[in-house]
A protein has these predicted regions:
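Hinge/lid segment of periplasmic solute-binding proteins
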Residues: 97-148, 174, 182, 201, ...
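Conserved N-terminal structural module of periplasmic/extracytoplasmic solute-binding proteins
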Residues: 2, 7-15, 22-103, 109, ...
Length: 427
């Protein structure tokens, strides 16, 4: 569930088409036929096996139904979904990311799932990410996630630095990075340009916000927010942090697993893939909660961005009745448990976190994901509002301009404030 490219989605095409009357799109093309043969479209091939376990469990109880899981890459997924929405040929079942929920829900594309989702079984964040602007639920919460601190135990041992734990603050992060660099020549904390897996977490730990609670006002220039952004950007000025140019050539993930750096932030959704991809590193790295802000403007200094994905179906699909029944199944404890036991994502259903945690030991992976689960207690909803597709690419470019020295940090923060304010006004 890579998030980096998620923020580059083109939404204007679908928005324009929908406003011309293609609301409540059905499924009349090659994707489905209305004969009990359904297509389930996802964007992550790594989760295909887990989704097939779900469909197999459902089909066992419904032998007349056939559901085919189709996986594509992220960019292709949204290109195809947008095209199918404007040509009345949507897949019967598909994933919906919070980035795009408002666009599809508010234009009548998605079926209302309010009657099949028991909101008490899911976190407020998971439900909010499945809602349209009208407050109705347009998808079944699939999973939930966290941003985690990944660290290399061997490098820490070489430097004589204690492993990160829940007492760590930003000061510990920088002090450990400095000592690691001095003792080993390896990078410490690798602070790459990113919002969800980067500076947003520091903003909310410092008591700041990117948007106000209802998403109607930008908060970049508020002291708690701007100070945290400056802190994060300035981390790159240390010798122990790679430059953004270096990250553009070699990702933090690649640098970490090749032994060049000791720490970076990653998504919980990446951990299973890390384990299966970098098998030679098994037992040499682990995960911890995010360091807290030592002197926040408000709050206790703890926060972590949490997001979620939803299962959805078209409002007027030919197989809508079957699709809705399947969504009811994946909303159940049984359906959510099956997904958790696949190991790729933390189930959205409250109380099933251990089904995901346990898969790591079951597969022989020597890390401790149970360390990160307590962060859900102070998690913060992924930053989003209906105008996000308009402002996000411009904000991202501004961040890159700051790093490149094309604009000062102060001017860049003001620019981000103006960009988001204008986008909200035009929505």
């Amino acid at each position: 569930m890579e998030r980096k490219n998620m923020r580059r989605i083109a939404s204007l095409v679908i928005a324009g088409a929908l406003t011309l009357g293609l609301t409540a799109c059905g499924t009349s093309g090659n994707e489905s036929s209305g004969d009990g043969k359904l297509v389930f479209q996802i964007w992550d091939a790594g989760q295909k096996a887990g989704m097939e376990k779900l469909t197999e469990a459902y089909m066992e109880e419904h032998p007349d139904v056939k559901i085919e899981v189709q996986a594509t890459g992220w960019d292709e997924y949204w290109t195809k979904l947008e095209a199918s929405a404007t040509s009345n040929s949507m897949p019967d079942i598909f994933w919906m990311h919070s980035n795009q929920m408002y666009k599809y829900a508010d234009n009548g594309i998605l079926a209302d799932c309010s009657d099949i989702v028991d909101a008490s079984c899911f976190s407020n964040i998971s439900i909010a990410n499945a809602e349209g602007s009208d407050g109705n639920i347009y998808g079944v919460p699939k999973d939930k996630d966290l941003v985690v601190l990944v660290y290399n135990k061997e490098i820490f041992n070489q430097a004589g630095v204690a492993y990160p734990d829940d007492t760590w603050t930003w000061d510990n992060l920088t002090e450990a990075s400095e000592k690691i660099y001095e003792q080993t020549g390896k990078y410490g904390y690798m602070a790459y340009a990113h919002d969800q897996v980067g500076y947003w977490n520091f903003v909310y730990q410092n008591g700041g916000e990117i948007l106000n609670e209802d998403g109607t006002k930008a908060e970049y220039t508020e002291k708690a927010t701007s100070d945290a952004i400056k802190f994060y950007v300035n981390l790159q000025n240390n010798d122990w942090c790679p430059t953004q140019e270096q990250f553009a050539n070699t990702s933090a993930t690649e640098q970490f697993f090749s032994g060049q750096g000791a720490m970076f932030f990653a998504g919980s959704w990446d951990l299973a893939n890390f384990c299966s991809t970098y098998t030679d590193m098994n037992g040499k790295w682990d995960v911890a909660v995010l360091p807290k802000c030592p002197n926040p403007e408000s709050g206790d200094g703890r926060a972590v961005i949490s997001n979620s994905v939803s299962y959805a179906t078209a409002a007027e699909g030919k197989n809508k009745d079957i699709a809705m029944d399947f969504l009811k199944f994946v909303a159940s404890e049984e359906g959510q448990r099956i997904q958790g036991e696949s190991g790729v994502a933390i189930p959205a259903y409250n109380g099933l976190e251990d089904t995901w945690v346990n898969t790591f030991a079951e597969n022989g992976y020597d890390i401790h994901p149970e360390n990160i689960i307590p962060m859900f207690e102070y998690s913060v909803k992924y930053v989003n509002n209906p105008s996000r597709p308009s402002w996000e690419p411009k904000v991202e470019q501004t961040v890159l301009d700051i790093y490149a020295g094309n604009t000062s940090v102060d001017d860049g923060i003001q620019n981000m404030q103006d960009i988001v304010t204008e986008a909200i006004a035009e929505e």
